[in-house]
A protein has these predicted regions:
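Gly/Ser/Thr-rich active-site loops/lids in small-molecule metabolic enzymes
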Residues: 2, 43, 151, 174-195
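Ligand-binding beta-strand-loop-alpha-helix segment within the catalytic cores
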Residues: 36-159
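Short beta-strand segments at enzyme active-site cores
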Residues: 15-28, 78-83, 159-162
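Short acidic, glycine/serine/threonine-rich loops at helix termini
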Residues: 27-32, 91-97, 171-174
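Short, catalytically relevant binding-site loops at active-site mouths
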Residues: 88, 165-168, 189
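N-terminal glycine-/serine-/threonine-rich phosphate-binding loop
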Residues: 1-17, 29-35, 151-155
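Alpha-helix C-terminal capping segments
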Residues: 8-12, 61-71, 191-195
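Short, basic, glycine/proline-bearing loop/turn elements
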Residues: 1, 128-136, 170-179
Length: 195
């Protein structure tokens, strides 16, 4: 339905660059990793890895949906998904006060146990639904592959980028490394439009 709603923009010749959320999906990925850790002793993956997984899977679904809508309308346009890193400041104050809830709800006991095992920080849900892991939600500074986004868009491609707000990375020793955080999808999409 969303792809159909955007079809008029495509027909008008607009260049579409799409961002998307991943809230429920990244929570599901975290549960999959947790189950793998408990049942098979597989390593649990960090938040940046989980965001990259959801960028790929949700982007794939958006591509399928858009290609179907385009084909029905007789429009020949490519749809491409980019795994996108978004730079954040390592000194962002949100790293000292994580507040963004992610993943499932836990009992207080289970949250304490999980915290002991992993070092994760939990906060009680204000509505009394349980305890949830919280992570920092720093401000996005730069879209790392913005030049590729621009180039693909200018060539007429529909570009899916900054999924889930982008993979949060910081610059360290001249290269980028992922961090345990989530970026607001609306802020990342706005930054994409500005850059």
């Amino acid at each position: 339905e969303t792809c159909e709603a955007l079809l008029d923009f495509v027909k008008r010749g607009d260049h579409l660059i799409l961002g998307h959320g991943n809230g429920p999906q990244v929570g599901n990925v975290m549960l999959q990793h947790e189950a793998g850790m408990k049942v098979f002793e597989l390593p649990s993956m960090p938040m940046d890895f989980c965001v990259s997984e959801t960028q790929g899977s949700i982007g794939y679904l958006i591509e399928l949906g858009f290609k179907k809508v385009l084909a029905k309308s007789g429009i020949n346009r490519n749809v491409v998904t980019l795994i996108t890193e978004v730079v954040v400041d390592k000194d962002d104050p949100m790293f000292k006060n994580p507040t963004k809830p992610v993943g499932p709800y836990y009992s207080e006991h289970d949250a304490e146990e999980y915290s002991k095992q992993t070092g994760a920080i939990f906060r009680e849900d204000p509505r009394g639904r349980g305890w949830r892991k919280v992570v920092p939600s720093p401000q996005p500074i730069k879209i790392n592959n913005i030049e590729i986004v621009k180039s693909l868009s200018e060539q007429g491609n529909i570009v899916v980028t900054v999924g889930g707000g982008g993979i949060p990375v910081i610059e360290k020793d001249g290269y980028f490394t992922g961090v345990e955080a989530v970026i607001d999808k609306d802020l990342a999409s706005s930054l994409t439009a500005i850059q």
